[in-house]
Protein backbone atom coordinates (compact mmCIF):
# COMPACT_ATOMS: atom_id res chain seq x y z
CA UNK A 1 0.00 0.00 0.00
CA UNK A 2 1.19 3.52 -0.78
CA UNK A 3 2.27 5.78 2.08
CA UNK A 4 -0.59 7.34 4.03
CA UNK A 5 0.45 10.94 4.62
CA UNK A 6 -0.99 13.26 7.24
CA UNK A 7 -3.56 15.80 6.09
CA UNK A 8 -2.54 19.49 5.86
CA UNK A 9 -5.80 20.79 7.32
CA UNK A 10 -5.49 24.55 7.74
CA UNK A 11 -1.90 24.66 6.40
CA UNK A 12 -1.52 26.98 3.41
CA UNK A 13 2.25 27.12 3.00
CA UNK A 14 3.65 24.94 0.22
CA UNK A 15 7.12 24.70 1.74
CA UNK A 16 5.79 23.50 5.09
CA UNK A 17 3.59 20.85 3.48
CA UNK A 18 6.50 19.47 1.46
CA UNK A 19 9.15 19.59 4.20
CA UNK A 20 6.80 17.92 6.70
CA UNK A 21 5.86 15.30 4.09
CA UNK A 22 2.15 16.07 4.37
CA UNK A 23 -0.38 15.18 1.68
CA UNK A 24 -0.04 17.44 -1.36
CA UNK A 25 -2.25 17.16 -4.43
CA UNK A 26 0.04 18.09 -7.32
CA UNK A 27 -0.99 21.34 -9.01
CA UNK A 28 2.48 22.27 -10.27
CA UNK A 29 1.70 21.58 -13.92
CA UNK A 30 -0.65 24.56 -13.75
CA UNK A 31 2.16 26.66 -12.26
CA UNK A 32 4.41 25.81 -15.18
CA UNK A 33 1.62 26.38 -17.71
CA UNK A 34 0.81 29.84 -16.40
CA UNK A 35 4.40 31.02 -15.98
CA UNK A 36 5.30 29.90 -19.52
CA UNK A 37 2.17 31.20 -21.27
CA UNK A 38 3.67 34.51 -22.32
CA UNK A 39 1.35 36.48 -20.05
CA UNK A 40 2.41 38.60 -17.11
CA UNK A 41 -0.69 39.63 -15.12
CA UNK A 42 -3.20 36.99 -13.97
CA UNK A 43 -6.32 36.96 -11.83
CA UNK A 44 -8.11 33.94 -10.36
CA UNK A 45 -11.46 33.92 -8.57
CA UNK A 46 -12.43 30.93 -6.44
CA UNK A 47 -14.58 30.45 -3.30
CA UNK A 48 -13.03 30.75 0.15
CA UNK A 49 -10.98 27.83 1.49
CA UNK A 50 -10.55 26.42 -1.98
CA UNK A 51 -6.74 26.29 -2.09
CA UNK A 52 -5.99 29.79 -3.40
CA UNK A 53 -3.52 30.62 -0.64
CA UNK A 54 -1.67 27.33 -1.11
CA UNK A 55 -1.49 27.99 -4.84
CA UNK A 56 -0.02 31.47 -4.24
CA UNK A 57 2.50 29.94 -1.83
CA UNK A 58 3.44 27.38 -4.48
CA UNK A 59 4.16 30.19 -6.95
CA UNK A 60 6.29 31.87 -4.29
CA UNK A 61 8.48 28.80 -3.78
CA UNK A 62 8.74 28.31 -7.53
CA UNK A 63 9.87 31.87 -8.22
CA UNK A 64 12.31 31.69 -5.31
CA UNK A 65 14.00 28.89 -7.25
CA UNK A 66 13.51 26.26 -4.54
CA UNK A 67 13.87 23.32 -6.89
CA UNK A 68 14.35 20.83 -4.07
CA UNK A 69 10.77 21.34 -2.88
CA UNK A 70 9.36 20.19 -6.22
CA UNK A 71 11.10 16.82 -6.38
CA UNK A 72 8.74 14.16 -7.69
CA UNK A 73 6.11 16.69 -8.79
CA UNK A 74 4.97 17.35 -12.35
CA UNK A 75 6.95 20.56 -12.74
CA UNK A 76 10.25 18.82 -11.98
CA UNK A 77 10.22 17.28 -15.46
CA UNK A 78 8.94 20.44 -17.14
CA UNK A 79 11.15 23.21 -15.77
CA UNK A 80 14.83 23.41 -16.74
CA UNK A 81 15.94 26.86 -15.58
CA UNK A 82 14.68 27.38 -12.00
CA UNK A 83 15.59 31.06 -12.09
CA UNK A 84 15.29 32.90 -8.77
CA UNK A 85 13.34 36.16 -8.78
CA UNK A 86 12.61 38.70 -6.04
CA UNK A 87 9.12 38.01 -4.69
CA UNK A 88 6.73 40.43 -2.97
CA UNK A 89 3.99 38.38 -1.34
CA UNK A 90 0.99 40.13 0.20
CA UNK A 91 -2.03 38.59 1.89
CA UNK A 92 -5.09 40.74 2.46
CA UNK A 93 -6.81 38.05 4.51
CA UNK A 94 -6.36 40.01 7.74
CA UNK A 95 -7.90 43.18 6.34
CA UNK A 96 -11.50 42.31 7.13
CA UNK A 97 -14.05 44.20 9.28
CA UNK A 98 -12.10 47.47 9.08
CA UNK A 99 -12.89 51.15 8.70
CA UNK A 100 -10.87 53.34 6.33
CA UNK A 101 -8.18 54.35 8.84
CA UNK A 102 -7.77 50.78 10.08
CA UNK A 103 -7.41 49.46 6.55
CA UNK A 104 -4.77 52.07 5.70
CA UNK A 105 -2.79 51.07 8.80
CA UNK A 106 -3.15 47.40 7.87
CA UNK A 107 -1.77 48.02 4.39
CA UNK A 108 1.03 50.03 5.96
CA UNK A 109 1.96 47.09 8.17
CA UNK A 110 2.04 44.69 5.21
CA UNK A 111 4.29 47.09 3.31
CA UNK A 112 6.54 47.56 6.34
CA UNK A 113 7.16 43.80 6.49
CA UNK A 114 8.47 43.84 2.93
CA UNK A 115 10.39 47.10 3.42
CA UNK A 116 12.29 45.50 6.28
CA UNK A 117 13.32 42.61 4.02
CA UNK A 118 14.63 44.99 1.35
CA UNK A 119 16.30 47.44 3.72
CA UNK A 120 14.02 50.42 3.14
CA UNK A 121 14.36 52.56 6.27
CA UNK A 122 12.66 55.79 5.20
CA UNK A 123 9.48 54.80 3.38
CA UNK A 124 7.12 57.19 1.65
CA UNK A 125 3.79 58.15 3.21
CA UNK A 126 1.21 56.87 0.73
CA UNK A 127 0.70 53.16 0.17
CA UNK A 128 1.00 53.36 -3.61
CA UNK A 129 4.32 55.24 -3.40
CA UNK A 130 5.61 52.67 -0.91
CA UNK A 131 4.70 49.81 -3.25
CA UNK A 132 6.46 51.56 -6.15
CA UNK A 133 9.55 52.00 -3.97
CA UNK A 134 9.49 48.32 -2.99
CA UNK A 135 9.30 47.16 -6.59
CA UNK A 136 12.08 49.57 -7.66
CA UNK A 137 14.34 48.55 -4.77
CA UNK A 138 13.90 44.81 -5.35
CA UNK A 139 14.48 45.30 -9.08
CA UNK A 140 17.62 47.40 -8.62
CA UNK A 141 19.17 45.25 -5.88
CA UNK A 142 18.77 41.98 -7.76
CA UNK A 143 18.90 43.11 -11.36
CA UNK A 144 15.87 40.92 -12.03
CA UNK A 145 12.23 41.61 -12.66
CA UNK A 146 9.97 41.37 -9.61
CA UNK A 147 7.18 38.89 -8.89
CA UNK A 148 4.12 40.30 -7.07
CA UNK A 149 1.71 37.84 -5.46
CA UNK A 150 -1.45 39.19 -3.82
CA UNK A 151 -3.69 36.70 -2.04
CA UNK A 152 -7.33 37.50 -1.21
CA UNK A 153 -7.09 40.93 -2.81
CA UNK A 154 -10.79 41.57 -2.12
CA UNK A 155 -10.93 40.51 1.55
CA UNK A 156 -11.29 44.10 2.87
CA UNK A 157 -14.32 44.64 0.63
CA UNK A 158 -16.40 41.51 1.12
CA UNK A 159 -18.09 42.70 4.31
CA UNK A 160 -19.22 45.96 2.71
CA UNK A 161 -20.23 44.68 -0.73
CA UNK A 162 -23.87 45.38 0.21
CA UNK A 163 -23.14 48.90 1.50
CA UNK A 164 -23.51 51.86 -0.85
CA UNK A 165 -21.73 54.04 1.73
CA UNK A 166 -18.72 52.01 2.89
CA UNK A 167 -17.90 50.14 -0.31
CA UNK A 168 -16.76 53.20 -2.34
CA UNK A 169 -14.59 54.43 0.54
CA UNK A 170 -12.71 51.16 1.06
CA UNK A 171 -12.57 50.50 -2.67
CA UNK A 172 -10.71 53.78 -3.17
CA UNK A 173 -8.15 52.76 -0.55
CA UNK A 174 -7.52 49.47 -2.34
CA UNK A 175 -7.48 51.14 -5.77
CA UNK A 176 -4.72 53.44 -4.53
CA UNK A 177 -2.70 50.48 -3.23
CA UNK A 178 -2.95 48.43 -6.43
CA UNK A 179 -2.41 51.28 -8.91
CA UNK A 180 1.41 50.87 -9.24
CA UNK A 181 1.00 47.43 -10.82
CA UNK A 182 0.41 49.16 -14.16
CA UNK A 183 3.05 51.88 -13.94
CA UNK A 184 5.76 49.44 -12.83
CA UNK A 185 5.04 46.93 -15.60
CA UNK A 186 8.60 46.93 -17.12
CA UNK A 187 10.04 45.94 -13.73
CA UNK A 188 7.60 43.07 -13.22
CA UNK A 189 8.11 39.43 -14.24
CA UNK A 190 4.79 38.04 -12.99
CA UNK A 191 1.74 39.36 -11.15
CA UNK A 192 -0.87 37.01 -9.70
CA UNK A 193 -3.93 38.05 -7.73
CA UNK A 194 -6.51 35.79 -6.15
CA UNK A 195 -9.85 36.55 -4.57
CA UNK A 196 -13.44 35.51 -4.27
CA UNK A 197 -15.20 38.29 -6.13
CA UNK A 198 -14.60 40.46 -9.15
CA UNK A 199 -14.60 44.23 -8.50
CA UNK A 200 -14.57 46.07 -11.81
CA UNK A 201 -13.71 49.52 -10.55
CA UNK A 202 -10.52 48.58 -8.77
CA UNK A 203 -7.51 49.80 -10.71
CA UNK A 204 -6.37 46.24 -11.35
CA UNK A 205 -9.34 45.80 -13.67
CA UNK A 206 -10.00 49.31 -14.97
CA UNK A 207 -6.38 50.45 -15.44
CA UNK A 208 -4.43 47.21 -15.72
CA UNK A 209 -6.17 46.40 -18.97
CA UNK A 210 -3.86 43.55 -19.93
CA UNK A 211 -4.69 41.35 -16.94
CA UNK A 212 -5.70 37.80 -17.84
CA UNK A 213 -8.70 36.54 -15.91
CA UNK A 214 -8.32 32.74 -15.89
CA UNK A 215 -11.28 32.13 -13.57
CA UNK A 216 -13.45 30.55 -16.27
CA UNK A 217 -10.76 29.23 -18.63
CA UNK A 218 -11.15 25.55 -19.45
CA UNK A 219 -7.40 24.93 -19.18
CA UNK A 220 -7.31 26.24 -15.60
CA UNK A 221 -10.64 24.84 -14.40
CA UNK A 222 -8.93 22.36 -12.07
CA UNK A 223 -6.22 24.66 -10.71
CA UNK A 224 -7.87 24.81 -7.26
CA UNK A 225 -9.88 22.18 -5.46
CA UNK A 226 -9.48 18.44 -5.92
CA UNK A 227 -10.68 16.82 -9.13
CA UNK A 228 -12.31 13.41 -9.16
CA UNK A 229 -9.28 12.04 -11.02
CA UNK A 230 -6.91 13.44 -8.39
CA UNK A 231 -9.04 11.94 -5.63
CA UNK A 232 -9.04 8.48 -7.21
CA UNK A 233 -5.31 8.50 -8.07
CA UNK A 234 -3.26 10.77 -5.81
CA UNK A 235 -5.57 10.14 -2.83
CA UNK A 236 -6.56 6.55 -3.62
CA UNK A 237 -5.11 5.07 -0.44
CA UNK A 238 -6.84 7.79 1.61
CA UNK A 239 -10.19 6.82 0.12
CA UNK A 240 -9.59 3.16 0.98
CA UNK A 241 -8.63 3.97 4.58
CA UNK A 242 -11.69 6.19 5.04
CA UNK A 243 -13.95 3.53 3.52
CA UNK A 244 -12.62 0.95 5.97
CA UNK A 245 -13.13 3.27 8.95
CA UNK A 246 -16.69 4.07 7.87
CA UNK A 247 -17.49 0.45 7.01
CA UNK A 248 -18.19 1.15 3.35
CA UNK A 249 -16.93 -0.30 0.10
CA UNK A 250 -14.60 1.89 -1.96
CA UNK A 251 -17.40 2.58 -4.44
CA UNK A 252 -19.84 3.50 -1.65
CA UNK A 253 -17.25 5.80 -0.08
CA UNK A 254 -16.58 7.59 -3.36
CA UNK A 255 -20.31 8.05 -3.91
CA UNK A 256 -20.79 9.48 -0.40
CA UNK A 257 -17.88 11.89 -0.86
CA UNK A 258 -19.27 12.91 -4.24
CA UNK A 259 -22.73 13.55 -2.78
CA UNK A 260 -21.36 15.71 0.04
CA UNK A 261 -18.42 17.60 -1.48
CA UNK A 262 -18.27 17.21 -5.29
CA UNK A 263 -20.23 19.07 -7.93
CA UNK A 264 -18.18 22.22 -8.56
CA UNK A 265 -17.40 23.31 -12.12
CA UNK A 266 -15.68 26.58 -12.98
CA UNK A 267 -15.74 26.52 -16.77
CA UNK A 268 -17.81 25.24 -19.67
CA UNK A 269 -15.45 22.25 -19.95
CA UNK A 270 -14.52 21.58 -16.34
CA UNK A 271 -13.71 18.37 -14.47
CA UNK A 272 -15.76 17.47 -11.41
CA UNK A 273 -14.18 19.31 -8.50
CA UNK A 274 -14.42 18.54 -4.79
CA UNK A 275 -14.26 21.15 -2.04
CA UNK A 276 -10.70 20.58 -0.74
CA UNK A 277 -11.27 21.94 2.76
CA UNK A 278 -14.24 19.68 3.47
CA UNK A 279 -12.69 16.67 1.76
CA UNK A 280 -9.47 16.86 3.79
CA UNK A 281 -11.38 17.43 7.02
CA UNK A 282 -13.65 14.46 6.32
CA UNK A 283 -10.63 12.22 5.78
CA UNK A 284 -8.74 13.58 8.78
CA UNK A 285 -11.73 13.12 11.11
CA UNK A 286 -13.22 10.03 9.42
CA UNK A 287 -16.62 11.71 9.33
CA UNK A 288 -18.74 13.36 6.66
CA UNK A 289 -19.85 16.72 7.98
CA UNK A 290 -20.51 20.31 6.91
CA UNK A 291 -16.93 21.54 7.40
CA UNK A 292 -16.74 24.30 4.78
CA UNK A 293 -20.05 25.83 5.76
CA UNK A 294 -19.20 25.61 9.47
CA UNK A 295 -15.89 27.42 8.91
CA UNK A 296 -17.53 30.75 8.10
CA UNK A 297 -20.98 32.28 8.36
CA UNK A 298 -21.87 33.92 5.03
CA UNK A 299 -23.35 37.04 6.64
CA UNK A 300 -22.71 39.23 3.61
CA UNK A 301 -24.47 36.67 1.40
CA UNK A 302 -27.51 36.53 3.68
CA UNK A 303 -27.66 40.33 3.61
CA UNK A 304 -27.58 40.35 -0.19
CA UNK A 305 -30.31 37.70 -0.42
CA UNK A 306 -32.46 39.98 1.73
CA UNK A 307 -31.53 43.07 -0.28
CA UNK A 308 -32.58 41.47 -3.56
CA UNK A 309 -35.58 39.73 -1.93
CA UNK A 310 -34.48 36.31 -3.16
CA UNK A 311 -36.75 33.50 -1.99
CA UNK A 312 -35.04 30.25 -0.90
CA UNK A 313 -36.80 28.32 -3.66
CA UNK A 314 -35.28 30.70 -6.23
CA UNK A 315 -31.69 29.80 -5.34
CA UNK A 316 -31.67 26.49 -7.18
CA UNK A 317 -31.47 25.55 -10.83
CA UNK A 318 -31.45 28.35 -13.39
CA UNK A 319 -30.01 29.22 -16.79
CA UNK A 320 -27.84 32.28 -17.35
CA UNK A 321 -25.49 33.96 -19.76
CA UNK A 322 -21.89 34.19 -18.54
CA UNK A 323 -22.19 37.95 -18.14
CA UNK A 324 -24.96 37.42 -15.59
CA UNK A 325 -22.82 35.52 -13.06
CA UNK A 326 -19.16 36.08 -14.00
CA UNK A 327 -19.68 39.77 -13.35
CA UNK A 328 -18.52 42.52 -10.98
CA UNK A 329 -20.27 42.31 -7.64
CA UNK A 330 -20.56 46.03 -7.00
CA UNK A 331 -23.54 47.59 -8.68
CA UNK A 332 -24.93 44.15 -9.50
CA UNK A 333 -28.61 43.92 -10.34
CA UNK A 334 -29.03 40.42 -8.88
CA UNK A 335 -27.35 38.28 -6.26
CA UNK A 336 -26.27 35.70 -8.86
CA UNK A 337 -22.64 36.92 -9.31
CA UNK A 338 -22.03 36.81 -5.56
CA UNK A 339 -23.71 33.40 -5.23
CA UNK A 340 -21.55 31.95 -8.00
CA UNK A 341 -18.24 33.53 -7.07
CA UNK A 342 -18.70 32.65 -3.40
CA UNK A 343 -19.34 28.99 -4.21
CA UNK A 344 -23.01 28.66 -3.28
CA UNK A 345 -24.04 27.92 -6.84
CA UNK A 346 -21.85 26.50 -9.59
CA UNK A 347 -21.89 25.51 -13.25
CA UNK A 348 -23.81 22.30 -13.89
CA UNK A 349 -24.05 22.42 -17.67
CA UNK A 350 -23.32 24.45 -20.79
CA UNK A 351 -25.13 24.66 -24.12
CA UNK A 352 -22.70 25.84 -26.84
CA UNK A 353 -25.57 26.58 -29.22
CA UNK A 354 -27.29 29.10 -26.95
CA UNK A 355 -24.14 29.86 -24.92
CA UNK A 356 -26.23 29.49 -21.78
CA UNK A 357 -24.96 27.95 -18.55
CA UNK A 358 -27.05 25.90 -16.14
CA UNK A 359 -26.31 26.88 -12.53
CA UNK A 360 -27.31 25.06 -9.36
CA UNK A 361 -26.26 24.37 -5.78
CA UNK A 362 -23.12 22.17 -5.95
CA UNK A 363 -23.77 19.45 -3.39
CA UNK A 364 -25.41 18.32 -0.17
CA UNK A 365 -23.06 20.26 2.10
CA UNK A 366 -23.91 23.59 0.49
CA UNK A 367 -27.62 22.87 0.08
CA UNK A 368 -28.16 21.86 3.70
CA UNK A 369 -25.77 24.47 5.10
CA UNK A 370 -27.29 27.31 3.11
CA UNK A 371 -30.86 26.50 4.07
CA UNK A 372 -29.85 26.10 7.71
CA UNK A 373 -28.52 29.67 7.54
CA UNK A 374 -31.85 30.85 6.12
CA UNK A 375 -33.93 28.93 8.66
CA UNK A 376 -34.00 31.68 11.36
CA UNK A 377 -35.81 33.95 8.90
CA UNK A 378 -38.77 31.57 9.04
CA UNK A 379 -38.80 29.80 12.40
CA UNK A 380 -37.09 32.26 14.74
CA UNK A 381 -33.62 32.41 16.20
CA UNK A 382 -33.77 29.30 18.41
CA UNK A 383 -31.83 27.32 15.84
CA UNK A 384 -30.79 24.60 18.29
CA UNK A 385 -34.38 23.63 19.01
CA UNK A 386 -35.27 24.18 15.36
CA UNK A 387 -32.47 21.87 14.18
CA UNK A 388 -33.54 19.22 16.70
CA UNK A 389 -37.13 19.44 15.49
CA UNK A 390 -36.05 19.08 11.87
CA UNK A 391 -33.88 16.07 12.69
CA UNK A 392 -36.85 14.36 14.33
CA UNK A 393 -39.08 15.29 11.40
CA UNK A 394 -36.55 13.72 9.05
CA UNK A 395 -36.72 10.42 10.91
CA UNK A 396 -40.53 10.47 10.79
CA UNK A 397 -40.66 11.24 7.07
CA UNK A 398 -38.19 8.43 6.32
CA UNK A 399 -40.77 6.14 7.94
CA UNK A 400 -43.51 7.75 5.83
CA UNK A 401 -45.08 9.22 8.96
CA UNK A 402 -46.06 12.61 7.56
CA UNK A 403 -48.76 12.97 10.22
CA UNK A 404 -46.14 12.68 12.95
CA UNK A 405 -43.88 15.16 11.14
CA UNK A 406 -46.69 17.71 10.90
CA UNK A 407 -47.45 17.29 14.60
CA UNK A 408 -43.78 17.90 15.36
CA UNK A 409 -43.71 21.06 13.23
CA UNK A 410 -46.96 22.37 14.71
CA UNK A 411 -45.66 21.90 18.25
CA UNK A 412 -42.45 23.72 17.41
CA UNK A 413 -44.11 26.65 15.64
CA UNK A 414 -46.23 27.20 18.75
CA UNK A 415 -43.04 28.02 20.71
CA UNK A 416 -41.54 30.67 18.44
CA UNK A 417 -42.26 34.42 18.42
CA UNK A 418 -43.80 36.40 15.60
CA UNK A 419 -41.83 36.41 12.33
CA UNK A 420 -41.90 39.27 9.85
CA UNK A 421 -43.96 38.79 6.69
CA UNK A 422 -45.79 35.85 8.28
CA UNK A 423 -49.14 37.05 6.97
CA UNK A 424 -48.74 35.66 3.45
CA UNK A 425 -49.10 32.16 2.07
CA UNK A 426 -45.71 32.60 0.39
CA UNK A 427 -43.99 32.90 3.78
CA UNK A 428 -45.21 29.48 4.87
CA UNK A 429 -44.48 27.98 1.48
CA UNK A 430 -40.87 29.13 1.71
CA UNK A 431 -40.63 27.97 5.32
CA UNK A 432 -41.73 24.48 4.31
CA UNK A 433 -39.33 24.58 1.35
CA UNK A 434 -36.38 25.43 3.60
CA UNK A 435 -37.26 22.76 6.15
CA UNK A 436 -37.70 19.98 3.59
CA UNK A 437 -34.51 21.05 1.78
CA UNK A 438 -32.57 20.68 5.03
CA UNK A 439 -33.98 17.15 5.27
CA UNK A 440 -32.03 16.50 2.04
CA UNK A 441 -35.06 15.58 -0.02
CA UNK A 442 -35.96 16.80 -3.48
CA UNK A 443 -38.40 19.66 -3.07
CA UNK A 444 -39.91 22.13 -5.51
CA UNK A 445 -42.58 24.82 -5.34
CA UNK A 446 -45.21 26.10 -7.75
CA UNK A 447 -44.93 22.97 -9.89
CA UNK A 448 -46.98 23.24 -13.07
CA UNK A 449 -49.74 20.77 -13.94
CA UNK A 450 -52.32 20.98 -16.76
CA UNK A 451 -54.91 22.33 -14.33
CA UNK A 452 -52.82 24.57 -12.08
CA UNK A 453 -49.76 24.75 -9.86
CA UNK A 454 -48.98 22.47 -6.93
CA UNK A 455 -47.80 24.58 -4.00
CA UNK A 456 -45.02 22.14 -3.12
CA UNK A 457 -43.77 18.72 -4.21
CA UNK A 458 -41.61 16.60 -1.89
CA UNK A 459 -39.92 13.45 -3.13
CA UNK A 460 -38.32 11.00 -0.72
CA UNK A 461 -36.73 7.66 -1.47
CA UNK A 462 -40.09 5.93 -1.08
CA UNK A 463 -42.92 8.43 -1.66
CA UNK A 464 -44.00 11.53 -3.54
CA UNK A 465 -45.90 14.13 -1.48
CA UNK A 466 -48.11 16.81 -3.03
CA UNK A 467 -48.76 19.78 -0.71
CA UNK A 468 -51.48 22.38 -1.03
CA UNK A 469 -51.16 25.23 1.48
CA UNK A 470 -53.99 27.50 2.60
CA UNK A 471 -54.10 30.58 4.81
CA UNK A 472 -57.02 31.25 7.19
CA UNK A 473 -59.14 28.50 5.64
CA UNK A 474 -58.93 24.81 6.52
CA UNK A 475 -57.22 21.60 5.44
CA UNK A 476 -60.41 20.37 3.77
CA UNK A 477 -60.26 23.31 1.36
CA UNK A 478 -56.67 22.47 0.54
CA UNK A 479 -57.44 18.80 -0.07
CA UNK A 480 -60.49 19.71 -2.13
CA UNK A 481 -58.29 21.75 -4.48
CA UNK A 482 -55.80 18.88 -4.90
CA UNK A 483 -58.60 16.51 -5.85
CA UNK A 484 -60.60 18.98 -7.93
CA UNK A 485 -57.61 19.88 -10.07
CA UNK A 486 -56.41 16.27 -10.23
CA UNK A 487 -52.82 17.17 -9.38
CA UNK A 488 -51.75 13.52 -8.88
CA UNK A 489 -52.27 12.73 -12.59
CA UNK A 490 -49.26 14.92 -13.43
CA UNK A 491 -47.03 12.61 -11.36
CA UNK A 492 -48.53 9.22 -12.24
CA UNK A 493 -45.33 8.09 -13.97
CA UNK A 494 -43.05 8.96 -11.05
CA UNK A 495 -42.91 5.33 -9.98
CA UNK A 496 -43.60 6.28 -6.37
CA UNK A 497 -46.75 6.10 -4.22
CA UNK A 498 -48.40 9.53 -4.17
CA UNK A 499 -49.49 11.11 -0.90
CA UNK A 500 -51.70 14.23 -0.87
CA UNK A 501 -51.24 16.68 2.01
CA UNK A 502 -53.53 19.66 2.61
CA UNK A 503 -52.28 22.15 5.22
CA UNK A 504 -53.85 25.31 6.63
CA UNK A 505 -51.98 28.10 8.44
CA UNK A 506 -53.48 30.79 10.65
CA UNK A 507 -52.20 34.38 10.43
CA UNK A 508 -53.13 35.21 14.03
CA UNK A 509 -51.20 32.30 15.58
CA UNK A 510 -48.60 31.97 12.80
CA UNK A 511 -49.03 28.23 13.05
CA UNK A 512 -50.62 25.21 11.44
CA UNK A 513 -54.27 24.85 12.43
CA UNK A 514 -54.97 21.53 10.75
CA UNK A 515 -53.83 19.20 7.99
CA UNK A 516 -55.28 16.34 6.02
CA UNK A 517 -53.44 13.41 4.44
CA UNK A 518 -54.78 11.09 1.75
CA UNK A 519 -53.04 8.32 -0.19
CA UNK A 520 -53.74 8.23 -3.91
Task: Tell where the protein language model's regions lie, with residue ranges.
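Phosphate-binding site recognition
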Residues: 1-424
Amino acid sequence: MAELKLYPVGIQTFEEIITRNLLYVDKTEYVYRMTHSGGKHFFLSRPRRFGKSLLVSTFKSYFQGKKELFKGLAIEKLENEWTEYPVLHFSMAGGKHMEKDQLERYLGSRLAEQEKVWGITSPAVDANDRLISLIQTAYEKTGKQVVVLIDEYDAPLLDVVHSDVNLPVLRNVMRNFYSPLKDCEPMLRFVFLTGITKFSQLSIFSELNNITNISMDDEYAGICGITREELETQMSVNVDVLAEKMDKSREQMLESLREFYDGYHFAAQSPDIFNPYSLLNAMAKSKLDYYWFSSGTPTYLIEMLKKFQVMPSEIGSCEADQSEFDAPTEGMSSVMPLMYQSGYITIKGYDPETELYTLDIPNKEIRVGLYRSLLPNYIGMNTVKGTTTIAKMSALIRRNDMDGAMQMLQAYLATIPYCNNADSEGHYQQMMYVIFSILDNYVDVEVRTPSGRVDMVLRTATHLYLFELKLNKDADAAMKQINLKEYPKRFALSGLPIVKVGVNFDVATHNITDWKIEHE
